[in-house]
Amino acid sequence: MTNGNNNNLEFAELKIRGKMFKLPILKASIGKDVIDISRVSAEADCFTYDPGFMSTASCQSTITYIDGDKGILWHRGYDIKDLAEKSDFLEVAYLMIYGELPSSEQYHNFTTKIAHHALVNERLHYLFQTFCSSSHPMAIMLAAVGSLSAFYPDLLNFNETDYELTAIRMIAKIPTIAAMSYKYSIGQPFIYPDNSLDFTENFLHMMFATPCTKYKVNPIIKNALNKIFILHADHEQNASTSTVRIAGSSGANPFACISTGIASLWGPAHGGANEAVINMLKEIGSSENIPKYVAKAKDKNDPFRLMGFGHRVYKSYDPRAAVLKETCKEVLNELGQLENNPLLQIAIELEALALKDEYFIERKLYPNVDFYSGIIYKAMGIPSQMFTVLFAIARTVGWMAQWKEMHEDPEQKISRPRQLYTGYVHREYKCIVERK
């Protein structure tokens, strides 16, 4: 994709070994501009070095904009707080995939297609039976999503219709697979999708209903989960999204690409942080212990860390956390736990103390999206091993939007990072009898 703001280019100058290079500065529509270093390796015979890609833009994108200093998160130009309060998850999914909010007719057609594709092939049931009963639901879902490649093996030569249909299939099937992963892990029968229910209701029904017991979805719980899904739908070029893009850049089957995103998301530094927050709050145990644990967090020689604080991008309050804090109170109030939920009380007091502490203020450590989401999940009856699974349901929308955008980009190339080699120089091979 070509950035339309770069007709009148400015240049940065870089001096390497006495030679001056002019590097184009690509203008962002908002936010930080980018220096184009794509010709440096060919012309200067050296690479750039950026561990963790903290200063590197790997692509151009129109999907998500983040200003970490100001606490801004926009999807296609819409503020995340507006989307969370006024929209629903499938409307946001449509926005992500197509770039615009849908009309009533477009929304109806889109949701109908999602419902139509929610079923998975019956043969997939046999795959679940190969896992031991103690398997983590993320492990099961990772394998199940990857196995969809076998059911759609022709998805290697794409056109625009294929991109859209593939995105719809993946968004539709991921909650079914997630619920199946949970049901198998607890030894209960699978529950089929119900097309009379909306996306979020359907997932909760597949999670908690049984063949002999109907599950009535509480509207407060449904709305809360809808917000959580919206808040987790996309977050620019994070680890899992970049993984999906890198896998997709080779032309791999899209279901295989999404499985790589799930694998990356499973890491405790990425999608598993909300489970770590719950464990931390349990460890703190009571409000009286908060000062002691805050002191431990400040001690660089103490391994204890405050989970749910700080973010690689945000240097102010995570806008998603602000929405989730209020959502958490709404859910617990509905369930009669607002005044007596010990985890919430510890979380609120811990946040209040941290926001007044110079140690956290100087380091710009504010609550992030993981700080309250786990408390909400736990109140809903969702076990901790399913927290990252629910994250994956929501983030699949972002992954598919990013995957689609990448394939539609005429400048797209197969990803090939370089390295700074620090190993041995050439060594002579010796036969084993000559080695000491």
UniProtKB/Swiss-Prot annotation:
Q: Name one GO cellular component term.
A: cytoplasm
Q: Does the keyword Acyltransferase apply?
A: yes
Quote one Gene Ontology molecular function term.
Answer: citrate (Si)-synthase activity
- Pfam families assigned: Citrate_synt
Keywords, A to Z, come to:
Acyltransferase, Transferase, Tricarboxylic acid cycle
Please verify whether the record's keywords include Acyltransferase: yes
Q: Where is the active site?
A: 311, 370
**Which pathway does this chain act in?**
Carbohydrate metabolism; tricarboxylic acid cycle; isocitrate from oxaloacetate: step 1/2
Please provide the Gene Ontology terms (biological process) for this protein. tricarboxylic acid cycle
Show the catalytic activity. Answer: oxaloacetate + acetyl-CoA + H2O = citrate + CoA + H(+)
Class in the EC hierarchy, top level: transferase
EC numbers on record: 2.3.3.16
According to the lineage, what is the superkingdom? Answer: Bacteria
Q: Which InterPro entries does UniProt cross-reference here?
A: Citrate_synth-like_lrg_a-sub, Citrate_synth-like_sm_a-sub, Citrate_synthase, Citrate_synthase_AS, Citrate_synthase_bac-typ, Citrate_synthase_sf, Citrate_synthase_typ-I
Give any extra note attached to this record. Citrate synthase is found in nearly all cells capable of oxidative metabolism.
Family assignment from sequence similarity: Belongs to the citrate synthase family.
PANTHER family named in the record? CITRATE SYNTHASE (PTHR42871:SF1)
| Protein name (database record) | Citrate synthase
Which organism encodes this protein? Rickettsia typhi (strain ATCC VR-144 / Wilmington)
